[in-house]
Amino acid sequence: MSNTQHRAEERRHAHRRTWLLTAAAAIALVGASVGAIAAATSGGSSASGTNYKRTGEISAMGMPVLETPGTASGTISTESVMATPSTWALGRVPLNVAVRPTWLLHNTGTDAITIGEPHVQINQGCCPGAFTMQGPSTLDPGVDTNLSFELSMHPGMDGPHDMTIHVPVQHADGTTETINLSVLGNFSD
């Protein structure tokens, strides 16, 4: 075999190796993509085995909404309003989904109160979401309403989050008070 023929044979073998490596890489990429899509469409699961359940809703940012994971705990009261829970500890929350922790606000006083626009204090993390009042914002004695807080993070916003929610309460006589709620979570894939 001449030197020219030998080099041509080496080029054919190199071409075959390159083709085989490219095909193997493409198959691996397709497999990883299918796995990621399957995890995303099922709601995903954490490393600890927690299964997340979709609500069937899509958030304002176009992300699937999951049932709020974690633990709701405690009760906090002021002169005229009681909030349950006082804290949402969400645990690990996947990226690119939305969760909506919700608090029940109950007028325990003797006069009507008005729930004002909540303000978020970021203790750690970033990017608070929108609040939604699910019910009336003016509560007669003994009346409840729900306050929900939509949270969704994407890559670059991941990591631990700690937020305090200051909810202003105005009385019929014009006096005000604030009830402080909290939400904690670790947003990551």
Question: How does the language model describe each region?
Answer:
Residues S45-S48, M157-D189:
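Terminal connector regions
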